[in-house]
Amino acid sequence: MSDNMASVDEVELGDEVLDESIEDDEGLVDTGASSLSYFGADFDVSGLVRRLDQKDIVIPRFEPDEAAGLSVEGFQRQRVWTASRMEKFVESLLLGWPIPSIFLVVEPDQRYLVLDGQQRLTTLQAFHSGFFPDGKEFKLKDVAEHLQGATYATLNDESRRRLDNTFIQAIVIEPQGEEGNDSIYRLFGRLNSGGVILTPQEIRVALYRGPLINWIRDLNQDAAWRSLFGAVHRKLKDHELILRVLAMRQVVAEVDGHWDDPEKRRSAYSPPMSQFLNNFLQEHRDMKALDAAALKEAFSQSCSLVLRALGQDGLKFLGRLNAAHIDALLSVLIYLCERGKAPDDAKVRDAITQLRADKKYIDWVSRSTSHRDNVFGRLESVYTALTSQ
């Protein structure tokens, strides 16, 4: 995915998104024994490139990029290294300088998924091919004098062998059991090996790639949703919010009519939020238990209701996009729309206006937003506001 991993800042780019659950989760994550094993392995550059070409090493990507030949089930991350940085990396190998390890995850089909080291590996593959991903010739320029102007094809035999025979250390991780992917998620939340920050959703999209992730990507293009959220978010915050809405809609369905039942509440939602979202993706990865057509229609209808009721600022709370408010409002609306109980525009407008002035609700969407009581507090408040006579 990239050459670095760190926790997401609570305020994202573009329209600001307040997501207090990120900080809140830090005190809630189970730090017990992880469900994974790992070992070190050394791969020569030639072998890495061969495995990449044969797709035995998978570089996850978010949007199809057939020209680059690196698309795997819909995931693509923007190429974040400049041409100059790619050239410097190749130069480092040719000069025999040490480079950081890469991190690989063993997939069920025995392929390797790259979770740290994407840019290094794509650079090696590009240099071997002779072309940058944009189609321009990969020729070394701002490098040591004796390497200037060189391509892989024009390297002398000694330099070519030095490059291809260079060993790159890999940490190979094997998930163990049902908790394996969640352990990997937590592990990469602690990595910080380069200069590109990975967000939680970028990790999820790689670890849980498949029909549900691809379907959420399609929902992210809904016209009303785009009007409410704004420009497509380069770090997938819009994608993550849709996931949260879908997961919370399942919670609403489980507790409707039993809001005060502690057993129902414990069964429907357990913090931290990050693990709750991971579990939802794991459970519904293949979408077999979800009615995609009905959910898509309800999602679009819900976004359109908010847009008609309050315009493009309909999802904003106290002047900002607020993740906790969005997951509560849209999840309840989707649940009601699915059951043919959609409120009219005026009701939606009045409900949101009421919620924006409710001191308890403001607290539930602003503090400790991953905690169970606050999750159910905001969900029930929205449900009551939208269904009361």
Language-model region placement:
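C-terminal active-site subregion of NodB/CE4 polysaccharide deacetylases
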Residues: 66
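A C-terminal-region feature
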Residues: 2-4, 35, 39, 385-388
